[in-house]
């Protein structure tokens, strides 16, 4: 039996035990995980360093190395994240609806776990912990398939999670499984594991996500890439617009809710775009601009078609001048990834048009795109940000990891 099948079977068996646990029992296990992360932080950092050194030898970019890195502060943040999940309401058993039919049948719709969740993700060790604790709290087992470049880190984290679960003696450690075989062939086999997996959630770049979406027969919760836009309207407050655009691009450029393109109304640009460009340059942002942007700032790289569709995940941004909110919406409709889109404006009609017509998980008025996040929305940790429309959309917290069932109580009714 392959490692994949064996671990998937074990996860499925564990999910049945996990589904019937009380909130208190699940929280007790999560508390042990949080404590164990802190107790073993030195071990975690030492194992992570093996991945960092291998990544440096392989020439991995500094941006990817930063995502991969575990520090004392980051392990502390992981443990705090587990504590925050403990504090969240448990959705399992929540009543969604209740009604009584004329024949006397009482029908309740309640939340239940999905079952076994397959996570496929790139070199982000924090996802190992986030996904595990969110799945456990929502009554699900999880099969983790991380990147080969984070294998030492992921093995160490899962071993720490297992020791926490063993200390609590409530949740079987088989509820959290890590695939150590990170080959593409095994990943493709995982895509077809309908007998054991209830859903697949990919987290990573566009190529990873699209390969899962196109090839999987297991249902997929698609976490899309973030080609996000900030549109500065003609009436935008200059100081606010510059602050929002710069924040959306530079506060943390390597994440999916960072802005990748700034669209600027031509009337606003006449007076203020040079200030925006100056502030971006202070933050060391490389700009790719259209001809009108280059006319103001000749040092800007000329933008080509590929720039409008690129998720840079770095200190790079595309800039374009538009003549109306309609032109901005059309550009976003063509190049956007349906993630997070913002308008900075004081014109109510334009704001309404933008918020209504832009197709995205989250649309903003006079705020940075950087708030599309489970913690910022008050959901706690997230397992990803869904850009699809079925089952879940936007930041996916605990509720997104549940399904529902109808519970029907009768008094002897039979169908006539």
UniProtKB/Swiss-Prot annotation:
Pathway(s) of this molecule: Amino-acid biosynthesis; L-proline biosynthesis; L-glutamate 5-semialdehyde from L-glutamate: step 2/2
Assigned keywords, A-Z: Amino-acid biosynthesis, Cytoplasm, NADP, Oxidoreductase, Proline biosynthesis
PROSITE patterns per record: PROA
Function: Catalyzes the NADPH-dependent reduction of L-glutamate 5-phosphate into L-glutamate 5-semialdehyde and phosphate. The product spontaneously undergoes cyclization to form 1-pyrroline-5-carboxylate.
Localisation per UniProt entry: Cytoplasm
Catalysis performed (reactions): L-glutamate 5-semialdehyde + phosphate + NADP(+) = L-glutamyl 5-phosphate + NADPH + H(+)
Family according to the record: Belongs to the gamma-glutamyl phosphate reductase family.
EC number, UniProt record: 1.2.1.41
The keyword Membrane appears for this protein: no
GO cellular component: cytoplasm
Pfam family, one: Aldedh
Molecular function via GO: glutamate-5-semialdehyde dehydrogenase activity; NADP binding
InterPro entries linked: Ald_DH/histidinol_DH, Ald_DH_C, Ald_DH_N, Aldehyde_DH_dom, G-glutamylP_reductase_CS, Glu-5-SA_DH, GPR_dom
EC top class, as a word: oxidoreductase
GO biological process: L-proline biosynthetic process
Protein name in UniProt: Gamma-glutamyl phosphate reductase
